[in-house]
Amino acid sequence: MPSKGIAVYSYISVPGYQIEFSVPGSTILNTSDDNFTAKGLEVDSSNIPGRLHFTGRFEWRVLQSDNVIHSAYNDINSLTGKVEEGTMTATVDFLPIVTEDAIITYGFYVAGHGKVGLTNRHQCYVTICSKDNATWMGSVAPSGSLQAQLPFSRFVLAAPHDNGMNSMTSCEAIFAAADEDTLADLRKFLPPLRFFDHLPNHLLLHKLPHVVYGLAITQKKEVPLMLALGARYFEFRPAKLLPIFRKLSKLPDKFYFQHSCIPGLAFDDFLAQQVEFLDAHPDEFVVVHIRWDGVVKGCERPTQEQIDEMLDEACSLAQQNPVEWGGRECFSEPIDALRRRGQRLICVVEAEKYDSWTAKAYATLTAEPILEQFEAMTTEGQEATDLTILQCQATSQSIKEVLVYSVMSARAATSCLTSTKALLDTQTLPWIRRNALQRLQAERMIVVMNDFIDGATTDTSIELSRQRLAVDYGQKEY
């Protein structure tokens, strides 16, 4: 009988919570014992009442003491595999749920028929982490404790990959006025557009939002929510709009996060949100790493003086607890010494990093090449750098066939970036938990980076921070 498969994943770190996944005729109930596992369900027409009825409901429910805290569903046609309607039909609708004691995040990928290596099974994940993650640094290194006398570099920090690309708002302001002349300019700056040379300009112009969505939108949460989840490291690529974009849009003339030349969050807004969080959480820190990897030359970059001025202006917004900013020298200083000075916004520019990412390895739909990169990293490799970065997300959009297929079949929840999110996390995050501290023992800060930041990623960084800040850390065998 016709059926459509759904792979389901969950992560739970708050006691008393369970996640139920169901389709007609079948139910899966996950607890924390099922973290980092993949399970499968089938919307099978044989379980759908009615001779010519093919549509069945896939639903997940978050339960606490048998009470339903939240739920979401999609109605799936078992004959075509398509999602006909539901509450998870567009990525922009996947808003986190904040309860009295937990933060729930989730995602759903609408799969096609398994073309170009992509999965033919819909993908759904749900994660539940503690609201206490908002104050985790104060918990693992309380003021006055022995842990807080250790260098800041002992922290392991979770990072939202391309955090400034969490919305299409800036892009939509440009695309609303884009024409074929705009497209001609964009072809010069966005090499992946050559993959669509077979399309007439008017059709490519129509598809442009889908191209950008598949290339660049790697987050879906606002910065305050990322911070509440426990993210503490943010790479930012500030630059002004391309001249042609300035002419087209009514966006303010200021510095934006840039993905090549695709604009995201404004830098001043980003800094203001960081300081607002630090002002309300006096034991917490944030690291901002300013870089310009891949930013096209036509996008004007801020000078160091301008960066300093924007940092000063942002820090001046603090009302309750002083917030000062510092540089890479803060990494080697005791945590409590930084707290006493109020130096809790650490900003580095083009710092040296020891990074797992390479273009070749990460152009993948599976975890194996990424795990091989992890396996090759050593303590010796860390020594000459400021930061060690373990990237969990694939850049499958750099595979021509994958990007083209995702764009041409685009719906609101079909970005190729979402197709691998949950499956990769079930392999990369457990590897990091088991092996990172054994393999990487230099006195350097470690960063765990991921797309669509979630509780499983942030909890990983918190647990490793707790281990690295243990008084007997240097004597342990991992």
Task: For every predicted segment, state its role.
Residues 154-157, 232-236, 286-290, 345-349, ...:
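Structural recognition of the beta-strand scaffold that forms the well-ordered cores
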Residues 214-220, 267-276, 317-339, 363-381, ...:
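A Trp-anchored, charged/polar loop motif used as the substrate-binding/catalytic surface
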Residues 258-322:
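Intrinsically disordered, low-complexity acidic segments that are enriched in bulky aromatics
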Residues 235-243:
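Substrate-binding cleft and catalytic face of glycoside hydrolase catalytic domains
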Residues 341-419:
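Aromatic-lined glycan-binding groove of carbohydrate-active enzymes
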Residues 216, 226-229, 235, 300, ...:
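N-terminal cap/leader regions of alpha/beta-hydrolase-fold enzymes
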Residues 2-229, 242-280, 285, 395-478:
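Long, acidic (Asp/Glu-rich), low-complexity accessory segments flanking structured domains
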Residues 160, 239, 291-295, 350-352, ...:
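Active-site beta-loop-alpha junctions enriched in small/polar residues
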